[in-house]
Amino acid sequence: MKNFKLAEPQSIEQALALLSASGDKVCLMSGGTDLLTEVKEGVAEPDIIIDLRTIPGLSYITKEKDAIRIGALTALADLARDPLIVEEYPGLHQAALAVATPQIRNVGTVGGNLCQRPRCWYYRDAQVNCRKKGGSQCFAYKGRNKYHALFGGGMCYMVYPSDLAPALISFDAQAVISTPRGDKTLPLADFYALPAKNIRRENILGPDELLHEVRIPLSKKEDKSAYIKLKERGAWDFALVSAAVKGTGSGAGWTDLRIILGG
């Protein structure tokens, strides 16, 4: 493992300033359950890690007049047991419970789950120089690809491992991104980037930007939702395939029915 410096900003502004001044050898850390694995295995070799946990006020679930606001550093365990989420957004509640183990959910965060790196074993092997790491080919195309994409491959056949993303997208969630130029809000569905757009990244965050909040429109009384995740093992695992479903109505009167596939 390469040595690195740990930065502990006290505000979002300080974190953005560190990002702007640190070039491309810097990583953001929230819970650290994914990033520290990459660092230990030599897949990520940052000079600086910015620990967002030292910034106060980024863990919250609040109901406003037009949306539910969820802070990026909200623990997955807190999201899963929040009464508002359990009662009004069962699909999101189920997705949060589907992540990993209770121990990991106590540490992992909403922002970390939405911004994690892919689980492709070629990408995760520091000795394999795949396209996502600057190489010339996707080894999954003709190699071991049991867990890779059936559709939309080409440059890279990785799939995205987040359980929260399909559920939140089914609720038409918005991502709030902090930048040195001010905050910007966009649909969470537009937060992600296919390999054809940027082979080295899975989202559209710029080098001086960070995700600090997710917003979900207020639920309606007639809303129904669910999340299902199929795994190879009975114990915790990443999805072979997953689906989030959200609709309004009942019986034959369904409107705005959405099915978001993952895994």
Language-model-detected regions and their locations in the chain:
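C-terminal structural segment of proteins
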Residues: M1-G263
